[in-house]
Curated annotation (Swiss-Prot):
Record-given protein name: Uncharacterized protein MJ0452
Taxonomic source organism: Methanocaldococcus jannaschii (strain ATCC 43067 / DSM 2661 / JAL-1 / JCM 10045 / NBRC 100440) (Methanococcus jannaschii)
Superkingdom of the source species: Archaea
Pfam families: DUF1890 (PF09001)
Amino acid sequence: MMSVLVIVGCPEPPALIPSVLYLTNQLKKKGFNVIIAANPAALKLLEVADDDKYYLKGVGAVDIDGGLRGIEGINKIISFVHNDGGVSYTVTYKAKYNKPTYAIVFGRQINKDYVETLKNSNIGVYTARAFHNPMPIVNRIKEILANL
């Protein structure tokens, strides 16, 4: 079974957590094993949003820094990026695992520097102007899933 590592940083944008749950559910439906590496606040928000583990059942979860110590069997990485920390983590995870990596760069405005830095690190970049409304992110997720 192929494993996808999902990177989730600071959960400030309201569109982030529902987008992560959507991605996780779609990956599971396609038969992927899913591991989420997230900051502690994002992990707590995911747990509260899905307290019955409808979407998160069978999903691994690690602290975002813990994921850099090494997780066996990662085949692909998908990262949500809306700030410079997200760029740094995505580039670092790509270097650590050397696996195909995709970043969804989103926010009220798209930061061209983030896009350029990620592309220069051989990371597939998808952009979405989204902060409150998750649908632009969901549409990019659909594009990524079509290419997995």
